[in-house]
Amino acid sequence: MGKVYDRFEERLEIQAIADDITSKYVPPHVNIFYCLGGITLTCFLVQVATGFAMTFYYRPTVTEAFASVQYLMTEVNFGWLIRSIHRWSASMMVLMMILHVFRVYLTGGFKKPRELTWVTGVILAVLTVSFGVTGYSLPWDQIGYWAVKIVTGVPEAIPVIGSPLVELLRGSVSVGQSTLTRFYSLHTFILPLLTAVFMPMHFLMIRKQGISGPL
């Protein structure tokens, strides 16, 4: 094993990378509230794992969605646990994200030179809320259906472009299969892809600039 490691070390300088990760300076004023972003990331990773597991059983059609969720909850081994963890971690992720935003704002972490870190963080916050809105509808029960109807109906109050926006969100004039398909695509593909782009940017900027000092 030693010879194998030495070959990789010679070419990739693994030890230097490890030293850089483990020896980063942490300011003395840092406390538990500075862990909220990391907790949000942990919740997101739990979401990815449990969400991926549920895609094996979920059927994104208006006739089968609810039944597939019921099957997952009652027939699949530990299916109830997987879905419950997904729901609990989703709620925890939103809560931790909100607290993280407040902590950064109250401690001035958005100020120069960390403006871009703040911008990517706000984008990630919007993506987090979007995950919640789209995921809430996927069981296609009464709560999910009416939540979608209300959320997608909000833009209708906008002059001129309101109605086209509603049709764009729903896929048609009314809520139906097109709406569920769009929300499922957003929840399982588009939003995760955008998160996979902005999250590394966010963490790399934090890594480069370090944690902001006390007020």
From Swiss-Prot:
<feature type="transmembrane region" description="Helical">
    <location>
        <begin position="186"/>
        <end position="206"/>
    </location>
</feature>
<protein>
    <recommendedName>
        <fullName>Cytochrome b6</fullName>
    </recommendedName>
</protein>
<dbReference type="GO" id="GO:0009535">
    <property type="term" value="C:chloroplast thylakoid membrane"/>
</dbReference>
<dbReference type="GO" id="GO:0016491">
    <property type="term" value="F:oxidoreductase activity"/>
</dbReference>
<dbReference type="InterPro" id="IPR005797">
    <property type="entry name" value="Cyt_b/b6_N"/>
</dbReference>
<dbReference type="GO" id="GO:0015979">
    <property type="term" value="P:photosynthesis"/>
</dbReference>
<feature type="binding site" description="axial binding residue">
    <location>
        <position position="202"/>
    </location>
    <ligand>
        <name>heme b 1</name>
    </ligand>
</feature>
<keyword id="KW-0472">Membrane</keyword>
<keyword id="KW-0812">Transmembrane</keyword>
<feature type="binding site" description="axial binding residue">
    <location>
        <position position="100"/>
    </location>
    <ligand>
        <name>heme b 1</name>
    </ligand>
</feature>
<keyword id="KW-1133">Transmembrane helix</keyword>
<comment type="similarity">
    <text>Belongs to the cytochrome b family. PetB subfamily.</text>
</comment>
<dbReference type="InterPro" id="IPR048259">
    <property type="entry name" value="Cytochrome_b_N_euk/bac"/>
</dbReference>
<keyword id="KW-0349">Heme</keyword>
<dbReference type="GO" id="GO:0046872">
    <property type="term" value="F:metal ion binding"/>
</dbReference>
<dbReference type="Pfam" id="PF00033">
    <property type="entry name" value="Cytochrome_B"/>
</dbReference>
<feature type="binding site" description="covalent">
    <location>
        <position position="35"/>
    </location>
    <ligand>
        <name>heme c</name>
    </ligand>
</feature>
<dbReference type="InterPro" id="IPR023530">
    <property type="entry name" value="Cyt_B6_PetB"/>
</dbReference>
<keyword id="KW-0813">Transport</keyword>
<dbReference type="InterPro" id="IPR027387">
    <property type="entry name" value="Cytb/b6-like_sf"/>
</dbReference>
<feature type="binding site" description="axial binding residue">
    <location>
        <position position="86"/>
    </location>
    <ligand>
        <name>heme b 2</name>
    </ligand>
</feature>
<dbReference type="InterPro" id="IPR016174">
    <property type="entry name" value="Di-haem_cyt_TM"/>
</dbReference>
<dbReference type="GO" id="GO:0022904">
    <property type="term" value="P:respiratory electron transport chain"/>
</dbReference>
<keyword id="KW-0934">Plastid</keyword>
<feature type="transmembrane region" description="Helical">
    <location>
        <begin position="116"/>
        <end position="136"/>
    </location>
</feature>
<keyword id="KW-0249">Electron transport</keyword>
<feature type="transmembrane region" description="Helical">
    <location>
        <begin position="90"/>
        <end position="110"/>
    </location>
</feature>
<keyword id="KW-0408">Iron</keyword>
<keyword id="KW-0602">Photosynthesis</keyword>
<keyword id="KW-0150">Chloroplast</keyword>
<dbReference type="GO" id="GO:0045158">
    <property type="term" value="F:electron transporter, transferring electrons within cytochrome b6/f complex of photosystem II activity"/>
</dbReference>
<comment type="function">
    <text>Component of the cytochrome b6-f complex, which mediates electron transfer between photosystem II (PSII) and photosystem I (PSI), cyclic electron flow around PSI, and state transitions.</text>
</comment>
<keyword id="KW-0793">Thylakoid</keyword>
<feature type="transmembrane region" description="Helical">
    <location>
        <begin position="32"/>
        <end position="52"/>
    </location>
</feature>
<keyword id="KW-0479">Metal-binding</keyword>
<comment type="subunit">
    <text>The 4 large subunits of the cytochrome b6-f complex are cytochrome b6, subunit IV (17 kDa polypeptide, PetD), cytochrome f and the Rieske protein, while the 4 small subunits are PetG, PetL, PetM and PetN. The complex functions as a dimer.</text>
</comment>
<feature type="binding site" description="axial binding residue">
    <location>
        <position position="187"/>
    </location>
    <ligand>
        <name>heme b 2</name>
    </ligand>
</feature>
